[in-house]
Amino acid sequence: MIYGCGIDIVSIKRIEDIYEKHGERFLRRVLTDLEMDYCMAQKAFPLNLAGRFAVKEAVIKAFKTGLSGGVTWHDMEVVSSGPPHVALSGRLQEISAGIGMKAISISIAHEKEHAVGLCIIEV
């Protein structure tokens, strides 16, 4: 049974502008070290950064928590070995156990101007 579905779309230019203004401070706020290393190694850095940002927003929406109650950007990590998937930790891991989560699926898509992230949580 589906517990939650979240979707988010972002302007790649907007994310690029935020990065140009705040630099590494922005990256450290929203990405884990592994995600940062992955994005920085890509030729299409802004595209990959925007995709990860969008899917993390989608995960937060699917859990219905927002960034509150102890949930942080670092409670989820987009893992890029094979098809992208999300690893949970901290408060989101606790919430997932509490709701009896059986599966979490994500998808990331991007094109020239936008990136979109989708998350479905099954219980």
Please give the residue ranges for each predicted region.
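Core catalytic alpha/beta fold that binds nucleotide/phospho-ligands
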Residues: 1-123
